[in-house]
């Protein structure tokens, strides 16, 4: 039984990596994705920026008991060997902890994908938990370059841009679309 956490900044290719690994996995598997508005258990998709997609079961972060029941149903009723979960940063850490425990007790591989930090450079609680409980060799960090024009440094921060400037405060979860850039330390703090 293996648990992995693949993380990176916005636009680094986490969903693409999930889809590639999911398609290469020969075990009986299911893909799931945290969702802010869709009902738990509805069928949707995980789609990467390159247009590739895979069918997925949506898990609403607000429905903790339902999320765990859906996961248990796939493990025990459908005999799933591997679970791939995208956008884990949206979950409360209690859901991640419960999924991790159920998967471990059932000898099911679970592969978590998501952001580690918010636009304010604070850890998402679910991601912080995963960084603590998953073995270092099973944490995969996808890197990318700074998106500031002319900068060649490695990006380290998800920056929410408001009126062309880095926003350092505000609600973590927004319903409307916002512009984000992956920035290096120098460009983030300038």
What do these predicted ranges mean?
Residues 103-127:
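Sensor-1/coupling segment of RecA-like P-loop NTPase cores
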Residues 144, 149, 182:
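Cys/His-enriched microdomains
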Residues 2-5, 29-31, 80-84, 109-111:
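Residue-level preference for the first positions of well-ordered beta-strands
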Residues 1-73, 118-129, 152-154, 166-190:
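Conserved P-loop
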Residues 127-146:
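A short helix-turn-beta junction within AAA+ P-loop NTPase domains corresponding to the substrate/partner-engaging
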Residues 21, 93-102:
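A short acidic, amphipathic alpha-helical/loop segment
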Residues 90-92, 119:
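Catalytic P-loop NTPase motifs of RecA-like helicase/translocase cores
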Residues 86-88:
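Walker B catalytic acidic pair
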């Amino acid at each position: 039984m293996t648990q992995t956490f693949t993380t990176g900044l916005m636009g680094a290719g986490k969903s693409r990596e999930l889809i590639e690994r999911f398609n290469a996995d020969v075990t009986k598997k299911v893909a799931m994705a945290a969702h802010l508005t869709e009902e738990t258990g509805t069928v949707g998709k995980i789609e990467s920026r390159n247009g590739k997609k895979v069918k997925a079961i949506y898990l609403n972060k607000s429905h903790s008991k339902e999320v765990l029941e859906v996961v248990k149903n796939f493990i025990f009723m459908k005999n799933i060997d591997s679970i791939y979960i995208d956008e884990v940063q949206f979950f409360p850490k209690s859901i991640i902890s419960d999924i991790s425990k159920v998967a471990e007790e059932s000898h099911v591989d679970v592969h978590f994908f998501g952001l580690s930090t918010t636009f304010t450079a604070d850890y998402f609680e679910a991601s912080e938990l995963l960084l603590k409980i998953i073995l270092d060799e099973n944490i995969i960090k996808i890197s990318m370059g700074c998106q500031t024009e002319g900068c060649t440094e490695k990006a380290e921060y998800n920056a929410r841009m408001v009126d062309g400037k880095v926003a350092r405060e505000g609600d973590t979860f927004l319903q409307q679309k916002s512009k984000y850039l992956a920035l290096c330390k120098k460009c983030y703090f300038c």
